[in-house]
Each structure stands twice: as structure tokens, then as C-alpha cells.
């Protein structure tokens, strides 16, 4: 608050700072203060790019500012759910931090008070969720934790494998769910032809 354009998130034992410009001396001093207050292992900064291409995505990987570096991949927890993240994967770390409220809504099966995500009749049995453009399946894991059988679609096999690891981190069997590699819009047409239906589409 009071620092427009500068975002700081705690990611496990690390702080992740994000802005569209390099850190100023005052910002670095504030990060040092926060690191001491929260017993942080290391602090990273990521330069935000509005429309990053492949080269820019790699260059925009979070850079260590001070402290100990993170391992290539490590697990963090949010609302009791574990996710694998990485500061070495380019522009994104494997979890969209600004979607935490939506992940919480999936976990609770409620969009808001009096607005259930699925009909009450389905709460105590499996319901079907489709996660198009699934990335590393963060939403899929939350839906599965909430009792859904989840179909996840992504154009990247690597990210779908990452998603399966997220399922395993949460003691969820990936074999009980479906992971579809390919173009999401093409898969939607195929699923429609197969008369597949879902209670929730993400």
C-alpha cells in the first residue's frame, strides 16, 4: 500500500518483488527491513514486461537481490495447498499469485456467501471441472481437493507434467484425473462432440 506499481509477495522462505523498473535504493532498504522482520532466506526482484516475448521472458526471470538463492524448484503452501514453484523458469514462477482468492473460492466451493460453486446435491459426491489453459494446474488441484474430477488442458506438455507433480504434492492421484495436451479451443470442440459436460469450467 502507498507504493503504486510495486508488488511484494512472500513465496515460502523468499520475498518476490515486482515492478516495471529496477529497484531504487529506498526500495532495497525496505526489502531489507521486511526480510529481517519475516526471517526471509532470500529476496528476488522481477522486472515486469507488458508483452514479453520468449527472450524477454527469460531475461525477466526473478533475480536474486540479496540473501541465499532458492533451489531450482521448491514447494510453497497457500491455504493448506502445496504448489511447486521456480524462480528459474522465466517470466512466471509456476503460480499466478494474484489468483489466490479464486483458488480459495474453488477450495471452499463458494464464489461468495449464498453463491455456491456447485449445486448442493453435488457437494458430497464427485463433480466435474474443466480447466482450460491450465498452466501448472493450480486451479485443478484446488478443484480436486474440493472433490472434483478435473480435466486439465494445456498446450505445453512440460506444464502439464508440472501440474501432475502439484497433484502428487497434495496426495492426489493424477491417474484419477485427465490431462489433455493440445490447443484448448480444439479440445473444447472435441469434448462437445463427445457430449462431455462439466459443472464448472475455468
Language-model segments: residues:
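Glycine-rich adenosyl-nucleotide cofactor-binding module
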Residues: 58-148, 161-162
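Conserved SAM-binding motif I beta-strand of class I
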Residues: 149-154
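S-adenosyl-L-methionine
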Residues: 158-200
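Short, well-ordered secondary-structure micro-motifs
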Residues: 55-56, 142, 189-192
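Local beta-strand N-terminus motif with an aromatic residue
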Residues: 40, 126, 197-199
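Non-catalytic substrate-recognition/targeting regions of SAM-dependent transferases
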Residues: 2-9, 25-97
